[in-house]
Amino acid sequence: MNQPVMQGVPALNVPDYVKHPRLVAWVGEVAALTKPERIVWCDGSQEEYDRLCAEMVAAGTMKQLNPAKRKNSYLALSDPSDVARVEDRTFICSQKKEDAGPTNNWTAPAEMRQTLNGLFDGSMRGRTLYVVPFSMGPLGSPIAHIGVELSDSPYVAVNMRIMTRMGRAVYDVLGTDGDFVPCVHTVGKPLAAGEKDVPWPCNPTKYIVHFPETREIWSFGSGYGGNALLGKKCFALRIASTMGRDQGWLAEHMLILGVTSPEGKTYHVAAAFPSACGKTNFAMLIPPAGLNGWKVTTIGDDIAWIKPRQDANGKTRLYAINPEAGYFGVAPGTSEKTNFNAMATLKENVIFTNVALTDDGDVWWEGMTDTPPAHLIDWQGQDWTPASAKETGRKAAHPNARFTAPAAQCPSIDPEWDNPAGVPIDAFIFGGRRSTTVPLVTEARDWTEGVYMAATMGSETTAAAAGQQGVVRRDPFAMLPFCGYNMADYFAHWLKVGEKLADSGATLPKIFCVNWFRKDENGKFVWPGFGENMRVLKWMIDRIEGQAQGEEHVFGVSPRYEELSWDGLDFTAEQFAKVISLDADAWKQELALHDELFTKLAHGLPQALPDAKTRLEERLGG
């Protein structure tokens, strides 16, 4: 299946175990366009990982950390211009503009392909093209899908080995004609003969482009995270959400956790929170003192793929997998206090990006310890001391600094996390960061009301001053930056999934809305959060089991004070009233803001949602 050298394109060097002619032809086409110096087919082995890491250390891209402190771990420092996802350079190039909808950037596919062809022509000159085969989800799972990323970044190759099931076994699943999502990535910095490379190559021009109908992803100019690790947001959410729309399943920006009661019964919950709302902390929650015998296990911390199928009793249920195999988490704010399990996961085999380096060869970031070290090398490679930070306000770690760590290292990992069949979902949770208005926890009375809650959820983008509401950014289902098609059609898809389940006689998962972030009149958080969120989770399970009555109000059903377990926590009925109360005037203003969202998404908006809003207004008495 090999091809001769032609037009300056290197030999493809196809390994014997790759038996997929369409894949080989595609690699040849991309190589002819991008003109790399050589092609390497990644096999996912430890030897390959170690070799690529050693090459990056030699190139100055990464530093090996002190093995006595962090075994087999590395620190990469990016270019200061390449530190986060670039939403304004992210495009959904569907055939029709209305299929992308008003919340996505759209360009006509033919026009975009012309632009990309110009950018990618010769873009890998002087570099190695890595062929990175990966499975999103356990190999061979009926819920999983396969992708192949062609990238000129060794940083991408090693991160994809941690974040996905990457390597030779993927070709066994693909066989000779299996489907795969083609992903092409370049840092966009070709090297002339003899030109010295920089430690973190990238290009000021950036494009992250998705073609939903052909299930293709093209990324130019960035070496960072979600822009370059194309299995993550690009495939697992943007492309997969369109696959789910077409095939009747869900690709969601959700953690998945297991909860086991003292009696030994296990439940599974999927929860969607926008960034900076504690998703990873909730996924790795440790129950507090007073809730002995309860256990929380982690299946995933970021993405869930959910497909309906029959269980052993012939009942249709929604089954979920974590399509990833690692955690790509935000480091700042993570500590043994806020997330003990995450810190335990980070002891070895980790790639850190844009955190600070300690004098003894370990890592540090803001929030890791109460007192920072006396001296650090910051994320830009400069000396940093607490005094210089005070003077200049400079952070030691970039606020979006990341860790890439294998999921299997998490102490709270669920024994079923790698089960190809997935786990059955008993409840969905949606939540944002709101200092006022939204109660601690509310259960939707039915699926449509739950979809309404999720469609209108939001988070404050600015710290709210006392008595003043922050600017609320609507982030429907926490999917605003990640939905690969028209958001109004996405709402309709959720309603349809619920209808189909109901028609099959299934018991639908309950839907809850939470808000851990209510503040008092002094601007202080009222609810303690973190492990104490288990008390709310326990009430949800009591509701699933029909053991808690709750109290119905305008917006759904919330717990009575006595229905939550307060053992080990001093939290008064007055404090509880502050986090659970509903202010009618605030809700009238809130519903007016929901109107703004619905006006923006009017094209294709399911009538069920304005109808649900009308019912809420009637209950409010106005």
UniProtKB/Swiss-Prot annotation:
Q: Name one GO molecular function term.
A: phosphoenolpyruvate carboxykinase (GTP) activity
Which Pfam family name is an example for this entry? PEPCK_GTP
* GO terms under cellular component: cytosol
Q: Output the GO biological process annotations, alphabetical, semicolon-separated.
A: cellular response to glucose stimulus; gluconeogenesis; glycerol biosynthetic process from pyruvate; oxaloacetate metabolic process; propionate catabolic process; response to lipid; response to starvation
Q: Does the keyword Cytoplasm apply?
A: yes
Q: Locate the active site.
A: C277
The UniProt entry lists the main location of this chain as: cytoplasm
User: Which residues take part in binding Mn(2+)?
Assistant: K233, H253, D302
Q: How is the cofactor bound?
A: Binds 1 Mn(2+) ion per subunit.
Reaction(s) catalysed by this chain, per the record, are: oxaloacetate + GTP = phosphoenolpyruvate + GDP + CO2
| Pathway(s) this gene product operates in, as recorded in its UniProt entry | Carbohydrate biosynthesis; gluconeogenesis
Q: Which InterPro entries match?
A: PEP_carboxykin_GTP_CS, PEP_carboxykinase_C, PEP_carboxykinase_GTP, PEP_carboxykinase_GTP_C, PEP_carboxykinase_GTP_N, PEP_carboxykinase_N
| Places the protein is found | Cytoplasm
Could you say which EC number(s) this protein's record lists? Answer: 4.1.1.32
Residues bound to GTP are A276, C277, G278, K279, T280, N281, R402, R433, F530, G531, E532, N533
Positions that bind substrate:
R85, Y224, G225, G226, S275, N400, A401, R402
Cofactor list: Mn(2+)
UniProt keyword terms in alphabetical order: Cytoplasm, Decarboxylase, Gluconeogenesis, GTP-binding, Lyase, Manganese, Metal-binding, Nucleotide-binding
Q: Which family does it belong to?
A: Belongs to the phosphoenolpyruvate carboxykinase [GTP] family.
Task: Outline what the protein does.
Answer: Catalyzes the conversion of oxaloacetate (OAA) to phosphoenolpyruvate (PEP), the rate-limiting step in the metabolic pathway that produces glucose from lactate and other precursors derived from the citric acid cycle.
The record's note on quaternary structure and interaction partners says: Monomer.
Name of the protein: Phosphoenolpyruvate carboxykinase [GTP]
What does the record give as the organism's lineage?
A: Bacteria, Pseudomonadati, Pseudomonadota, Betaproteobacteria, Burkholderiales
Q: Which gene encodes it?
A: pckG
